[in-house]
Amino acid sequence: MPAVCESLLDDIEDMVSATDPKPHDRQSARKNIVPRARKRNKNNIQEEEPPADSTIPGTQKIWIRTWGCSHNNSDGEYMAGQLAAYGYSITEQPEKADLWLLNSCTVKSPAEDHFRNSIKKAQEANKKVVVSGCVPQAQPRQDYMKGLSIIGVQQIDRVVEVVEETIKGHSVRLLGQKKDNGKRLGGARLDLPKIRKNPLIEIISINTGCLNACTYCKTKHARGELASYPVEELVDRATQSFQEGVCEIWLTSEDTGAYGRDIGTDLPTLLWKLVEVIPEGAMLRLGMTNPPYILEHLEEMAKILNHPRVYAFLHIPVQSASDSVLMDMKREYCIADFKRVVDFLKERVPGITIATDIICGFPGETDEDFKETLKLVEEYKFPSLFINQFYPRPGTPAAKMEQVLAHVKKRRTKELSQLFHSYDPYDHKIGQKQQVLVTEESFDSQYYVAHNRFYEQVLVPKDPDFMGKMVEVKIFEAGKHFMKGQPVQDSYIYTPSITKPLAKGEVSGLTEELKPPNNIPKSETLLEKHWERLQVFLFLTALLAAVIAFVGTKLV
């Protein structure tokens, strides 16, 4: 049996037909065989290729719209600077922009309405949208912001990341607070690139948040508790600004008077350090401060406001002259405290301008309460008065209080406005000679806008030699909100001891390594940058095509 099996296996392995071709013949025949190539689907090949208009972040045009306070405007300038430094083009024409960056304000309902309408308009125009500011920070779950990218008020240093991801089609939300070892910081760094709306004016936020808990305020929900920047960082920022040709600095925050209480310093200490670096011919303007925190420093504040390079101007919101209303607002002062601050400063700083705010129709305000407010305005005749009809903001205690009827709020707002327009604060200054600092153009483009020692607005003729300079003028006309001045003949036009200002739209804060050469226009520099990117893209595309062709020949 085994022998039979072995014989069978040998026969099977060795079995060859007499008609089979020999191995040599098979090899020769193989050379004449042409393999059939599988037909390619041209449509599929085209679909696999990258689209010709691939989106490359950093090449788009961006339109930025900011609502609200000077703090918010400073944030908008920082975001514009970072985007421009990265390569994006900042445009003032929304219809030409690829992306709209909407920087919102939550103080009053009308401002939020404008913000919401702008989002809708952007979406209808098929624009990419990024939102920032106090509205999304305080209430990010609003239905009209679903699917939108959000930059929190303390995350503006990451605007490039958010815009880049949004352009790619992603939705990004950065709403966190900045902390150092658990301690809250003032916000993004002060030395970030920036595009000043006015190259002559630098807005510096000295702190964010506040120590109060006003029952009507929605901003507190967004900006949070007080967090101050160190004195050294603020002085460095001011110094850098003057080196870039700025001739006027605005100090801003939700409450400048509270500055430093969280880091062991105070506002007068900061101000004395700042005046040391203000060049001759440049000026500093102090922003809004609430009465409680200025009371402790009245003597020092009076000395500082008398300094020749500090405007004799202070914005102190009173909101109401009724103690019962102030208590419901949780303003933490009484009307006597406010009067003490104003009276002291008017006595120690002759001619000082006191600006204030008043809310008409706060919940629970009676006719008697409102009459107290009218008496206060009649007594002090504030030259600058911001009158606001009360709007309940969602999530605030005041929104849950019993509301004053709408027609009553409107009547009180109108009555206070009529009182304000019944007196002329500047008529007595006609004929005076004043030194004014010229910083901008009027809205109607007919005049240059300047401010005198008391930060009162003076319109002067449009002489290019005046811009950014101290000019002596004689007042010949006065209106409700301004005066008009004629330059005094043969008077000396004083040029501040600072460098030439940056061009409009030029990025502040860039190191020399990052700055383009001065003789190359910005648009030219951006074009070269984009052309370099395009060259790299074309090279990689050609290389890929060569590889595909080589592989194809091998397959054949």
From Swiss-Prot:
Enzyme Commission code(s) on record: 2.8.4.5
Domain TRAM per the UniProt entry, residue ranges: 427-489
InterPro entries on file: Elp3/MiaA/NifB-like_rSAM, Methylthiotransferase, Methylthiotransferase_CS, Methylthiotransferase_N, Methylthiotransferase_N_sf, MiaB-like_arc_euk, rSAM, rSAM_horseshoe
Membrane topology: Single-pass membrane protein
GO cellular component: endoplasmic reticulum; endoplasmic reticulum membrane
Source organism of the structure: Xenopus laevis
Cofactor: [4Fe-4S] cluster
Gene Ontology molecular-function annotations: 4 iron, 4 sulfur cluster binding; metal ion binding; N6-threonylcarbomyladenosine methylthiotransferase activity; tRNA (N(6)-L-threonylcarbamoyladenosine(37)-C(2))-methylthiotransferase
Disordered: region residues: 17-57
Boundaries of every Radical SAM core domain copy: 196-427
Any one GO biological process: tRNA methylthiolation
Compartments where found: Endoplasmic reticulum membrane
Function: Catalyzes the methylthiolation of N6-threonylcarbamoyladenosine (t(6)A), leading to the formation of 2-methylthio-N6-threonylcarbamoyladenosine (ms(2)t(6)A) at position 37 in tRNAs that read codons beginning with adenine.
Catalytic reactions of this protein: N(6)-L-threonylcarbamoyladenosine(37) in tRNA + (sulfur carrier)-SH + AH2 + 2 S-adenosyl-L-methionine = 2-methylsulfanyl-N(6)-L-threonylcarbamoyladenosine(37) in tRNA + (sulfur carrier)-H + 5'-deoxyadenosine + L-methionine + A + S-adenosyl-L-homocysteine + 2 H(+)
SUPFAM superfamilies associated with the record: Radical SAM enzymes
Protein name in the entry: Threonylcarbamoyladenosine tRNA methylthiotransferase
Record-listed [4Fe-4S] cluster 1 binding positions: C69, C105, C134
NCBIfam families linked: MiaB-like-B, MiaB/RimO family radical SAM methylthiotransferase
Domain spans labelled MTTase N-terminal: 60-168
Gene3D superfamilies assigned: Methylthiotransferase, N-terminal domain, tm_1862 like domain
Keyword set, alphabetical order: 4Fe-4S, Endoplasmic reticulum, Iron, Iron-sulfur, Membrane, Metal-binding, S-adenosyl-L-methionine, Transferase, Transmembrane, Transmembrane helix, tRNA processing
Transmembrane segments: 536-556
